[in-house]
Amino acid sequence: MARRRQIYEGKAKILYEGPEPGTLIQYFKDDATAFNAQKRGTINGKGVLNNRISEHVFTLLGNIGVPTHFIRRLNMREQLIRQVEIVPIEVIVRNVAAGTLSKRLGIEEGTQLPRTLIEYCYKDDALGDPLVAEEHIACFNWCSQDELHDIQDMAIRINDFMSGMFAAVGIRLVDFKLEFGRLYEGDFSRIILADEISPDGCRLWDMTTNEKLDKDRFRRDLGGEVEAYQEVARRLGLLPEGGDNAVLDLESHRKKKG
């Protein structure tokens, strides 16, 4: 088998050259980081679960007309995606006060916000992904006004859809992050949804108990990370009800066998 060329490695994923021009292969790792990679660890099986959950969400979003980079899932840990130029802005959509918003503004965690709040962070690990305003985005030309409008419209549409999707399975969508990219088509480009949507980048709370079903379990040393991710997958119908919730990861299985 020919060795694939690695294009980029991030905290949770690796991008490889795709089989056709304009495509990439996105590999989901088990590595876990928090606080801009100041805390590091491993959640066994996380990459497999995130690959499956993200495939499910991106497919549903595509069905309602949200353009995404997702083409298809290749195997347990990999997806075929469209190659895009990433907009250097992390978009955070908030429905409920939690995390840094609660700390910055002194709002009790769990407080329902009077309206959906969209925040922007400049994507730069060395700077700690600082919070920025729309004026910064315009001043430094990180994206055009038209592109920002497209991003805002898609973010609200995604939030409306995902809030309903998760509520239907007893999960409260507290907040989540999105990344967008430019897909070039000849001399023109358009904004599409990129990266992933999974418990790594969403705050998901059980509607009845407020139990955290996301990466906050790792951030706050609560334990039970894999079980929480599995529970999200199970409620979305991606794992069988009852019985063994284990996700078969062939790669890890082979390593254990030696």
Swiss-Prot record:
Pathway: Purine metabolism; IMP biosynthesis via de novo pathway; 5-amino-1-(5-phospho-D-ribosyl)imidazole-4-carboxamide from 5-amino-1-(5-phospho-D-ribosyl)imidazole-4-carboxylate: step 1/2. It is an enzyme of class 6 (ligase). One of its GO terms (biological process) is cobalamin biosynthetic process. Keywords: ATP-binding, Ligase, Nucleotide-binding, Purine biosynthesis. It comes from the Bacteria. One of its GO terms (cellular component) is cytosol. InterPro entries: SAICAR_synt/ADE2_N, SAICAR_synt_PurC, SAICAR_synth, SAICAR_synthetase, SAICAR_synthetase_CS. The keyword Nucleotide-binding applies. Its EC number is 6.3.2.6. CDD domains: SAICAR_synt_PurC. It catalyses: 5-amino-1-(5-phospho-D-ribosyl)imidazole-4-carboxylate + L-aspartate + ATP = (2S)-2-[5-amino-1-(5-phospho-beta-D-ribosyl)imidazole-4-carboxamido]succinate + ADP + phosphate + 2 H(+). Disulfide bonds: none annotated. Belongs to the SAICAR synthetase family. PANTHER family: MULTIFUNCTIONAL PROTEIN ADE2, SI:DKEY-6E2.2. This is Phosphoribosylaminoimidazole-succinocarboxamide synthase.
